Design a protein with these regions (language model features):
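Carbohydrate transferase catalytic cores enriched for Leloir-type hexosyltransferases
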Residues: 2-244
Length: 244
């Protein structure tokens, strides 16, 4: 989905990129999709059309990716537990985001993850849950999500999906899980694929294969398997191994 295109009806309105979800250390796909979007907006020279909200530790990094972007910062919680972080994100999205919308003339809000606040905003919102495995795969092998976390996430996703105007699924697996567990919101889902970014020379001489890399997936169909295959495809001519 081209979020910038949603703004064409009113050029004075801006997009709020809600990046309050970014971790101190890169957390994989959850963070990368946000970075990819910001880089894309920067390359299209649309920096004046967006405002970024984040915890203060992410400010310098985001400004490096997109020089000139307007960045609004919030101080992170002093304690770093999962529950404290989740509650603080809910606080920011429930009370601070509406103020940012009014002050910066925001027309669309993009949430880079879940936990989007306890009330529906007055402007359209787009969100990416990334996956709902705490609900859909409570038990995976020897790992089991605690019952209170299961209930918390089950309610949180329901509230987020109810308030969102569009829900972005990063893969067919994510889309089918959301449709299965939250069927009433299936018409809001838009599926995309978040590409990885690897710099490889355009012309690479083939290398004779000397062995194999074996990848085993015994859990369930997941976008990470697609990412693995695509990543290997990009470097296949650089190494002397085949992927099985």
């Amino acid at each position: 989905m081209n979020v910038v295109r949603m703004m064409k009806e009113d050029e004075q309105k801006k997009i709020l990129l809600n990046y309050i979800y970014l971790s101190r250390q890169h957390a994989g796909g959850k963070d990368q999709v946000a970075i990819n979007l910001l880089e894309g907006i920067c390359k299209n020279k649309d920096m004046g059309a967006c405002v970024v909200l984040c915890y203060d530790y992410a400010k310098a990094y985001l400004e490096q990716i997109a020089p000139g972007v307007t960045v609004i910062t919030v101080k992170p919680p002093k304690k770093e537990s999962e529950l404290v972080r989740l509650l603080d994100i809910e606080r920011v999205n429930t009370w601070i985001v509406p103020k940012v919308i009014r002050k910066y003339n925001i027309g669309v809000v993009f949430h880079a993850s879940c936990t989007n606040g306890l009330r529906k905003l007055k402007v359209p919102t787009v969100m990416i849950p990334h996956d709902i495995k705490a609900v859909s795969h409570r038990v995976m092998g020897s790992v089991k999500v605690a019952w209170y976390k299961y209930l918390l996430y089950k309610v949180m996703y329901a509230v987020d999906f109810k308030h969102a105007d569009k829900i972005i699924a990063i893969s067919k697996a994510d889309r089918s899980e959301i449709q299965n567990y939250y069927a009433r919101y299936k018409d809001k889902i838009v599926q995309i694929y978040n590409p990885i970014k690897v710099h490889v020379n355009d012309v690479i001489p083939p290398t004779p294969k000397k062995g194999d890399i074996v990848a085993i997936n015994l859990q369930f169909h997941h976008k990470n398997i697609i990412t693995l295959i695509k990543a290997f495809e990009m470097i296949a001519d650089c190494i002397d191994l085949s992927l099985i």
